[in-house]
């Protein structure tokens, strides 16, 4: 995979695929600008090298039609503020008017194009849409790890039509961190997998058995595993069609002498509500009609001990419904343990990234990934289409 350090950029027009798919508040303001900040090292590097910079991104799911609420104009404004000079926003992403504006760029100047997904061709990996984007540049840079698991025109097809294509700093760093944490880790390697559904993490669970020394399972998905071991989990969320699969994973871990750790106690509630009645119970004593919404304190302590023994930690998925105060302690205990561990720690994006930020320990992790789906894709042992396209 070629990187930006291997390319001469002076006076060349560069199209950089970034991920500015930003969370917005109810007033249309950016709620979190971390994804913009993550691209600043690359943007500043290209400015210093005298490139003419065209930034391209999607935002949300407009389904091939323009939607004012999903415009990237606020991203251009915020990037201008962070850089200290104007980033020009163009209200389209392909066509003669866009090409004309790009041709007017001077070295060190930046344009941000409008939302790529305002055209159906982006998500369809349409070669004609990709060709139209490629006509805007001499060099293509992919710095959008978080969408590199998608076969999109600006991620995959575009590489067939540009003279030079390479990875940006963020994509390069993400791929390297993944390699160092899973494909070539310092052992013991402990994977912590949580979240709601076994079905969404099944590929990751099965692939992790090929790499880990210990596998810690929390979140609502643990209910399916607990049921597979003969526990009655009351009204807790269980994927009945995957109970047998969960039992197979537990047995597979035993056969491979992998320490698979399940909860021993749970925080249960009489309903799914922040104001619900709650109790801490043993996994064998969940009351009928009650549901598990977090791991219990004894489980948190057991998980923490396993984490402390690790030399490498990979964490994807919260331990409970951490957005509700009564059910956030399990995630907090795990976050604190990972932060305190003398280990190389990589945290998957999405909810887990949000959780470590809320717990105030993001800066104690070795790396917090910018990608949820892309990170999971790698955990499943799959190649990223966006990375393969650069080879």
Curated annotation (Swiss-Prot):
Catalyzed reactions: (2R)-3-phosphoglycerate + ATP = (2R)-3-phospho-glyceroyl phosphate + ADP
An annotated GO cellular component: cytosol
Annotated positions binding substrate: 19-21, 35, 58-61, 117, 150
Enzyme class (EC, first level): transferase
Keywords on record: ATP-binding, Cytoplasm, Glycolysis, Kinase, Nucleotide-binding, Transferase
GO biological process: gluconeogenesis; glycolytic process
Functional pathway: Carbohydrate degradation; glycolysis; pyruvate from D-glyceraldehyde 3-phosphate: step 2/5
Gene3D superfamilies: Phosphoglycerate kinase, N-terminal domain
Record InterPro entries: Phosphoglycerate_kinase, Phosphoglycerate_kinase_N, Phosphoglycerate_kinase_sf
GO terms, molecular function: ADP binding; ATP binding; phosphoglycerate kinase activity
Entry's EC annotation: 2.7.2.3
Signal peptide: none
Subcellular location: Cytoplasm
Amino-acid positions noted as binding ATP in the UniProt annotation, renumbered to this chain: 201, 323, 349-352
Similarity field: Belongs to the phosphoglycerate kinase family.
Subunit structure: Monomer.
Protein name, UniProt field: Phosphoglycerate kinase
Gene name per UniProt: pgk
């Amino acid at each position: 995979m070629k990187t930006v350090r291997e390319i001469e950029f002076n006076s060349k027009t560069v199209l950089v695929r970034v991920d500015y798919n930003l969370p917005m508040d109810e007033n249309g303001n950016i709620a979190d600008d971390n994804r913009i900040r993550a691209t600043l090292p690359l943007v500043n590097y290209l400015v210093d090298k005298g490139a003419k910079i065209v930034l391209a991104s999607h935002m949300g799911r407009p389904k091939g039609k323009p939607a004012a609420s999903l415009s990237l104009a606020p991203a251009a404004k915020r990037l201008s503020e962070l850089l200290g000079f104007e980033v020009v926003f163009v209200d389209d992403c392909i066509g003669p008017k866009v090409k004309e504006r790009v041709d007017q760029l001077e070295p060190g100047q930046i344009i941000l194009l409008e939302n790529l997904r305002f055209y159906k061709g982006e998500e369809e990996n349409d070669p004609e849409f990709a060709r139209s984007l490629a006509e805007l540049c001499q060099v293509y840079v992919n710095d959008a790890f978080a969408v590199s698991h998608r076969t999109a025109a600006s991620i995959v097809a575009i590489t067939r039509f540009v003279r030079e294509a390479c990875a940006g700093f963020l994509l390069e760093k993400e791929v390297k961190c993944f390699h160092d944490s899973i494909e070539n880790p310092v052992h013991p390697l402990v994977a912590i997998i949580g979240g709601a559904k076994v079905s969404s993490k099944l590929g990751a669970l099965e692939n992790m058995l090929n790499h880990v020394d210990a596998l810690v399972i929390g979140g609502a998905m643990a209910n399916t595993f607990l049921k597979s071991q003969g526990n009655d989990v009351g009204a807790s969320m269980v994927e009945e069609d995957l109970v047998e699969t969960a039992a197979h994973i537990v047995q597979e871990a035993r056969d491979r002498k992998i320490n698979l750790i399940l909860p021993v106690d749970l925080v249960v509630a009489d309903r799914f509500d922040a104001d619900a009645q709650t109790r801490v119970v043993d996994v064998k004593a969940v009351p009928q009609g009650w549901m598990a919404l977090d791991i219990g304190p004894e489980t948190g302590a057991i998980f923490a001990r396993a984490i402390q023994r690790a030399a490498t930690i990979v964490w994807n998925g919260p331990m409970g419904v951490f957005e509700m105060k009564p059910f956030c302690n399990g995630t907090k205990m795990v976050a604190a343990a990972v932060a305190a561990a003398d280990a190389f720690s990589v945290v998957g994006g999405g909810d887990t990234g949000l959780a470590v930020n809320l717990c105030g320990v993001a800066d104690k992790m070795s790396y917090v990934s910018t990608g949820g789906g892309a990170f999971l894709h790698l955990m499943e042992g799959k190649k990223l289409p966006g990375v393969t396209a650069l080879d």
